[in-house]
């Protein structure tokens, strides 16, 4: 399994998951199409491995659990050479991001079913997170929206050539993704084919994942400052993805 679904197939599969005994006539009524049209979509779902037969017997879903940060990313891009201690002409752009969110998004584009587990606030940025997730097919069923909390933010300032001058993050809400937080979703995590984490998570949370998950754990470092959070669990990771600077910190070996 893992072949991508059309929007209509995804919609029909969702209804079947809610009621495996639903008839094709009822599905046709909900979709606003003919019963034969529904039959064709059901046939495609069977060919793609999502349904095993009439009834409907659903194939246990294979998926990846992605745990980490959702951010509102803000980028300041200088138009000319940067002058220190002064205002610089440039452009400012914003977009929903975060390492875990971006991994979830790209897995979806590759046709890999996944669930994102994260936290965000009830502020304006949090509403952007929700609308962006729905628009891009990111499943945030297991993301918690905290009241009276700010969504994680990341600010990057780059020069005219695209080289980063400084990056700042305000990710206090990610500290709420504790082992106790993840225990609410442990069945989702434990039944995943693989688990992906990023190093924005608290050290104790990373340790909990590596101690309790029996499937492969993949980790992505988010910054030099947070790379050290993965040091205690390196031996338990299946794969670690990091930059040159981050690799030097983790291994202690200079990269030339």
Where in this protein do the model-derived segments appear?
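Glycine-rich beta-alpha junction loops
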Residues: 68-72, 121, 223-225, 246
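Conserved beta-alpha-beta core of the PfkB/ribokinase-like small-molecule kinase fold
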Residues: 194-256
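Short glycine/proline-enriched coil/turn segments at helix->beta-strand junctions
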Residues: 20, 32, 112, 190-191, ...
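Short gly/ser/thr-rich secondary-structure transition/capping motifs
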Residues: 47-49, 175-180, 219-225
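Conserved N-terminal subdomain of the carbohydrate kinase-like
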Residues: 60-61, 80-90, 109-193
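Glycine-rich phosphate/adenosyl-contacting loop at the front of the ribokinase-like
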Residues: 2-17, 22-30, 34-117, 124-128
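Residues that scaffold the ATP/ADP-binding catalytic core of kinase and kinase-like folds
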Residues: 54, 75, 167, 249-251
């Amino acid at each position: 399994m893992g072949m991508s679904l059309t929007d209509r197939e995804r919609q029909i599969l969702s209804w079947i998951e809610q009621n495996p005994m639903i008839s094709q006539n009822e599905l046709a009524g909900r979709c606003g199409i003919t019963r034969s049209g529904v039959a064709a979509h059901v046939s495609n779902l069977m060919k793609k491995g999502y349904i095993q037969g009439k009834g409907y017997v659903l194939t246990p879903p294979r998926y990846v659990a992605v745990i980490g940060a959702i951010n509102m990313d803000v980028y300041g891009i200088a138009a000319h050479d940067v002058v220190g201690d002064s205002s610089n002409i440039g452009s400012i752009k914003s977009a929903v991001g975060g390492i875990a969110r971006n991994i979830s998004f790209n897995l979806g584009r590759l046709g890999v079913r996944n669930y994102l587990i994260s936290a965000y606030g009830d502020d304006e940025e949090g509403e952007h997170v929700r609308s962006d997730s729905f628009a891009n097919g990111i499943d945030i069923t297991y993301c918690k929206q905290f009241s009276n909390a700010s969504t994680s933010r990341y600010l990057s300032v780059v020069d005219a050539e695209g080289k980063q001058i400084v990056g700042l993050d305000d990710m206090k809400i990610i500290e709420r993704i504790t082992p106790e937080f993840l225990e609410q979703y442990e069945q989702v995590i434990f039944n995943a084919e693989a688990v992906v984490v990023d190093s924005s998570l608290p050290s104790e949370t990373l340790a909990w994942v590596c101690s309790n998950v029996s499937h492969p754990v993949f980790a992505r470092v988010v910054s030099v400052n947070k790379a050290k959070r993965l040091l205690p669990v390196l031996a338990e990771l299946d794969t670690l993805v990091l930059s040159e600077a981050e690799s030097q910190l983790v291994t202690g070996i200079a990269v030339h």
